[in-house]
Amino acid sequence: MNNNKVYSLNVVSFEKIIFNDFVKKIQVSGSEGELGIYPGHLQLLSLIKPGPLLILDDHDYQHVIYISGGIIEVQPTVVSILADTAIRGLDLDLNVVLDKKLKLENKISNVDCIDRNDVIQQLSCELAKLRVIEMFKNQYIKKNN
């Protein structure tokens, strides 16, 4: 392993360690836009928006993880992500996500909805999960063709 071409990535949620390995690059949605983190990246501290975390590990295998939000800290040889919630693409259930999305859409259309912004935020998270499921599915299809 050439240390100039990889760095250590730690992804943890409040419940458990999701990922801890050497990687070549990651891509995640930061508070100010998309972040592509490569070896030797400048130090950085940023909020993370809900969406996919794309990882290319040191064996050229791609991982897709849903992040509901959190913080990323970039150091010269280590990147740490503390996620509010983190779920591997493999563990997301399409039917559960679609069902929750439909319920939230119906709730938004209800004019009596008390906290519309909260429902919109929840819907945004479900849409991000759907993007992760789609990315995982596409990655699986490419790998098996």
Curated annotation (Swiss-Prot):
Membrane topology recorded in Swiss-Prot or TrEMBL: Peripheral membrane protein
PANTHER family given in the database record: ATP SYNTHASE DELTA/EPSILON CHAIN, ATP SYNTHASE EPSILON CHAIN, CHLOROPLASTIC
Subcellular location: Cell membrane
Pfam families recorded: ATP-synt_DE_N
Organism classification: Bacteria, Pseudomonadati, Pseudomonadota, Gammaproteobacteria, Enterobacterales
Alphabetized SUPFAM superfamilies for the sequence: Epsilon subunit of F1F0-ATP synthase N-terminal domain
Domain of life assignment: Bacteria
Gene: atpC
Major localization class: membrane
Task performed by this protein: Produces ATP from ADP in the presence of a proton gradient across the membrane.
Any GO molecular function: proton-transporting ATP synthase activity, rotational mechanism
Oligomeric and partner information: F-type ATPases have 2 components, CF(1) - the catalytic core - and CF(0) - the membrane proton channel. CF(1) has five subunits: alpha(3), beta(3), gamma(1), delta(1), epsilon(1). CF(0) has three main subunits: a, b and c.
Species for this entry: Buchnera aphidicola subsp. Baizongia pistaciae (strain Bp)
Name this polypeptide is given: ATP synthase epsilon chain
